């Protein structure tokens, strides 16, 4: 070993010690997770929920678009029909052990029934506990879009209501008037 190599090695050791002392007194970037929550942006894609209309009914019309667009096939549902002609899901099931939280189901939903909330604490030791049914997903409020009502904007007539007496709702669109 030459004197030059010894001096370079000594200076490298001094530089390493100075870097350690510099970082000892700087603020730590690590968050103490359970006690100190992380900031999540408003567009964070977390747990999937099902929302309700303004009147308290289910928004989901069982169109099956969410299940079709899901890349990992974690959504399953079965359509049923009410007496007034509206569709609703007889069962709605999401397997969160397969879900990749891509948000495609939220984008595909025409009724804004499916929404992603900023909940990310879904871990469990048993995989069967990560299969959520409709009762687990359905919340009591309208979620992110409180004023949105699918049937008001789509102009679909409900069997029990007369077209003349739609209170505060748009009349149904006559599709034949739209033809060229």
Curated annotation (Swiss-Prot):
InterPro entries for the chain: 4Fe4S_Fe-S-bd, 4Fe4S_Fe_S_CS, NADH_quinone_OxRdtase_chainI
Gene Ontology MF: a single term: NADH:ubiquinone reductase (non-electrogenic) activity
Binding note for cofactor: Binds 2 [4Fe-4S] clusters per subunit.
GO biological process: aerobic respiration
Record localization: Cell membrane
UniProt KW keywords: 4Fe-4S, Cell membrane, Iron, Iron-sulfur, Membrane, Metal-binding, NAD, Quinone, Repeat, Translocase, Ubiquinone
UniProt record similarity statement: Belongs to the complex I 23 kDa subunit family.
Binding site for [4Fe-4S] cluster 1: 60, 63, 66, 109
Location, primary (coarse class): membrane
Described function: NDH-1 shuttles electrons from NADH, via FMN and iron-sulfur (Fe-S) centers, to quinones in the respiratory chain. The immediate electron acceptor for the enzyme in this species is believed to be ubiquinone. Couples the redox reaction to proton translocation (for every two electrons transferred, four hydrogen ions are translocated across the cytoplasmic membrane), and thus conserves the redox energy in a proton gradient.
Pfam family name, one: Fer4_7
Native organism taxonomy: Bacteria, Pseudomonadati, Pseudomonadota, Gammaproteobacteria, Enterobacterales
Any single Gene Ontology cellular-component annotation: plasma membrane
Gene: nuoI
Membrane topology recorded in Swiss-Prot or TrEMBL: Peripheral membrane protein
Full protein name: NADH-quinone oxidoreductase subunit I
Catalytic activity from the UniProt record: a quinone + NADH + 5 H(+)(in) = a quinol + NAD(+) + 4 H(+)(out)
Domain 4Fe-4S ferredoxin-type, chain residue ranges per copy: 50-80, 90-119
Cofactor(s) required for function per UniProt: [4Fe-4S] cluster
Subunit architecture: NDH-1 is composed of 13 different subunits. Subunits NuoA, H, J, K, L, M, N constitute the membrane sector of the complex.
